[in-house]
Design a protein with these regions (language model features):
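Conserved ABC transporter NBD signature motif
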Residues: 56-67, 71-72
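Catalytic Walker B motif of ABC-type/P-loop ATPase nucleotide-binding domains
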Residues: 154-157
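Conserved ABC ATPase signature
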Residues: 129-133
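Walker A (P-loop) phosphate-binding loop of ABC-type ATPase nucleotide-binding domains
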Residues: 35-39
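Conserved ABC ATPase "signature" region
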Residues: 96, 100, 107-125
Length: 211
């Protein structure tokens, strides 16, 4: 299990949002720390194949992630900073909807959804409408949906944004629990989000990595 960034750059005109990033990651939790505008989200969107790098390569076990296509996306779980959901769906129905998008068979999806909702402390809220949930609850459902396909790579972009201190602690504990046997990349501008759970912390500033 190895993820490699090789001279990865994303340029918008003369601005380098990500600037020649080179790094290797294996199993564990990696904290990507930086202020808003440092390039974290751009890097994560490339990692999730939402946008292409201007130059450089991102490799999974030695193969370019963009050439791997659907097989790569099948081992990827992603929680964006602002993820969309249908407010009138129940928590359970939302999970089943995402499971169908990810191609899970209904019998597998049902078991997986119920297990994950239990794991994130949302089983008792599974019949509640998404629009009735607090910010912390929405983030917990968010990480549950990202885990539906049992991903090898879990990407969390500013997962504690807008949460109170108690919810941040709960979320950190959850990330630690879910990190076994997978690679977790967690981006944040809050030091405490990563200092207790990350195996390695990388500072990102003006599109570059600092160690």
């Amino acid at each position: 299990m190895e993820l490699q960034f090789k001279n990865v750059t994303k340029a918008y005109g003369d601005v380098h949002a990500v600037d020649h990033v080179t790094h290797s990651m294996e199993k564990g939790v990696y904290g990507l720390l930086g202020v808003n505008g440092a390039g974290k989200t751009t890097l994560m969107r490339m990692l999730c194949t939402a946008i292409n790098p201007t130059s450089g390569e991102i490799l999974w076990n030695g193969k370019d992630i963009f050439s791997l296509g659907a097989s790569y996306r099948g081992i990827l779980g992603y929680l964006p900073q602002n993820y969309g959901f249908y407010p009138d769906l129940s928590v359970y129905d939302y999970m089943m909807y995402i499971a169908s998008i990810k191609g899970l068979r209904p019998i597998v999806a049902k078991k997986r959804a119920l297990k994950l909702l239990e794991q994130v402390g949302m089983a008792e809220k599974r019949k509640k409408k998404m629009r009735t949930l607090s910010g912390g609850m929405i983030r917990r459902v968010g990480i549950a949906q990202a885990m539906l396909n049992d991903p090898r790579i879990l990407v969390l972009d500013e997962p504690t944004a807008g949460l109170d201190p108690n919810e941040r602690i709960r979320f950190r504990n959850l990330v630690s629990e879910l990190s076994e046997d997978r690679l977790v990349l967690l981006s944040t501008h809050i030091v405490s989000d990563v200092e207790y759970v990350a195996n390695e912390i990388i500072l990102m500033k003006e599109g570059k990595f600092f160690y």
